[in-house]
UniProtKB/Swiss-Prot annotation:
Function field: Actin-binding protein that regulates actin polymerization, filopodia dynamics and increases the branching of proximal dendrites of developing neurons.
Example GO biological process: regulation of actin filament polymerization
GO MF terms, alphabetically ordered: actin filament binding; actin monomer binding
Similarity comment: Belongs to the ABITRAM family.
Keywords: Actin-binding, Cell projection, Nucleus
Protein name (Swiss-Prot/TrEMBL): Protein Abitram
Pfam family, one: GCV_H
Protein's UniProt keywords contain Aminoacyl-tRNA synthetase: no
Entry-linked Gene3D superfamilies: 2.40.50.100
GO cellular component terms attached to this protein's record: dendrite; filopodium tip; growth cone; lamellipodium; nuclear speck; nucleus
Taxonomic placement: Eukaryota, Metazoa, Chordata, Craniata, Vertebrata
Subcellular location: Nucleus speckle; Cell projection, Lamellipodium; Nucleus; Cell projection, Growth cone
């Protein structure tokens, strides 16, 4: 379901960004919001994992000993059984060949509809097609929160300004 929807990302989704999640420089995320409220969580283009020379070695949806996002079982129209996520809920941990580990957060309140199991067997999808087949998870905000879900997120234009400021501050030093 969501994978097929994610494929039409550029056409049917509105793109929003969250920069420096949890105060970590450049750890930026992107949410693709569909008009039906569904939000697809992806890495933003400036995320360290998407930079040249990075190789993803593992992706782990096991958040804690008692919580695995892979155990999320959703059924029915009301999405019964879906794990509820807060803005700071971790979705997965991704390790790279340089020894760095990145925690990917939901940053959207709502029900976890699905995680992308395809990236477990093919982590390169995350880097090659981050906005389509390389998405991380699909979250459905509560109906009453669906309009406010983008508060605090950046438009593509605002995100470009953030990237320009970073570039200018790094080239100025």
């Amino acid at each position: 379901m969501a994978a097929a929807e994610a494929l039409g990302a550029a056409r049917y989704f509105t793109r929003w960004y969250k920069a420096d999640v949890k105060g970590r420089p450049c750890e930026d995320f992107c949410v693709l919001q569909h008009s039906n409220r569904i939000c697809v969580i992806t890495l933003a283009e400036a995320h360290p994992l998407l930079q040249p020379g990075k190789t993803i070695t593992s992706i782990n949806y096991q958040i804690s000993p008692n919580c695995s996002r892979l155990q999320n079982k959703v059924s029915g129209k009301s999405k019964r059984g879906a794990q509820f996520l807060t803005e700071l809920a971790p979705l997965c941990r991704i390790a790279s060949s340089d020894g760095e580990e990145y925690t990917i957060y939901s940053f959207i309140r709502g029900r976890l509809i699905e995680v992308n199991e395809n990236i477990l067997s093919n982590p390169a999808l995350l880097q090659e097609k981050p906005s389509t087949e390389g998405y991380i998870a699909v979250v459905l905000p509560k109906f009453e929160e669906s309009k406010s879900v983008t508060q605090g997120l950046l438009t593509p234009e605002e995100y470009k300004e953030v990237l320009l400021k970073r570039q200018n501050s790094s080239s100025g030093s």
